[in-house]
Regions:
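Arg/Lys-rich amphipathic alpha helix in sigma70-family domain 2
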Residues: 61-65, 78-96, 102-106, 130, ...
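Short, Lys/Arg-enriched C-terminal cap helix and immediately downstream tail that follows
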Residues: 64-65, 86-89, 144, 149, ...
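Short, charged helix-capping/linker segments at alpha-helix termini
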Residues: 13-22, 32-51, 150, 173, ...
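C-terminal edge and immediately downstream basic/flexible tail or linker adjoining helix-turn-helix-like DNA-binding
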Residues: 11, 93-103, 108-111, 136-139, ...
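N-terminal module of bacterial RNA polymerase sigma factors
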Residues: 1-30, 37, 116-126, 139-142, ...
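Structural recognition of an alpha-helix C-terminal capping motif at a helix-to-coil junction
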Residues: 47-54, 67-79
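Sigma70-family region 2
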Residues: 13-14, 40-41, 51-68, 86-89
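Helix-turn-helix DNA-binding module
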Residues: 3, 135-175
Length: 199
């Protein structure tokens, strides 16, 4: 952690509004982006930002500096976001097993296969940029179980390393890699089913 970050954190913890404002200008956008990625709801993400910075003020004096300040803030954000989502439970999450492809004992894919060979290459830019595809992706992320969603957002949206994600979610790197792989597989399956059906 930089000396400047430590100074700002110490001052914010003692009630210095200017220091808190400086920390917010550095980290609020990242906190919001992560919170929105997990809660999938703008008002909830805004509440998470407020709660995170309140915790930073309340717990800042106890921060030991063993991790980078950004990692500590990401961990607080992840925990607050997951708690917010658990408290709401407005949307039902889907079991990951329901989202992944199924295979027969001989190794072939079970079920409808016409969408597997759908050709998306004709218009990849248009398909990726369309609002419908964005909404489809967001809906697919919404259906992921929360611990898969958190890892996916931290790794693929926030572009943190597997080691950083593991530290933030309090798990091993191997577990993070497994969750990330399963989350990506589930997203791929959902997108393939939808986009392949229209081909």
């Amino acid at each position: 952690m930089s000396a400047d970050d430590r100074t700002l954190l110490t001052r914010a913890a003692t009630g210095d509004g200017g220091a808190l404002e400086a920390l917010m200008s550095r980290y609020a956008a990242r906190v919001y982006r992560l919170a929105y990625g997990i809660t999938r709801n703008a008002p909830d993400a805004e509440e998470v930002v407020q709660d995170v910075f309140l915790q930073i003020v309340n717990k800042g004096a106890g921060f030991e500096g063993r991790a980078a300040l950004a990692s500590w803030i990401y961990r607080i954000t992840t925990n607050v976001s997951l708690n917010k989502r658990r408290g709401k439970r407005r949307e039902l999450e889907t079991s990951l097993d329901e989202l992944l492809p199924t295979f027969l004992p001989d190794g072939h894919r079970a079920g409808e296969r016409s969408f597997v060979v759908a050709d998306w290459s004709a218009t990849p830019d248009r398909e990726l940029l369309s609002g419908e595809s964005r909404r489809l992706l967001e809906a697919a992320i919404d259906r992921l179980p929360e611990h898969y969603r958190a890892v996916l957002v931290l790794r693929d949206v926030e572009e943190l390393s597997n080691e950083e994600v593991a530290q933030i979610v309090g798990d091993t790197v191997a577990a993070v890699k497994t969750r990330l792989h399963r989350a990506r597989m589930a997203l791929r399956e959902q997108l393939t089913r939808h986009l392949g059906a229209g081909a």
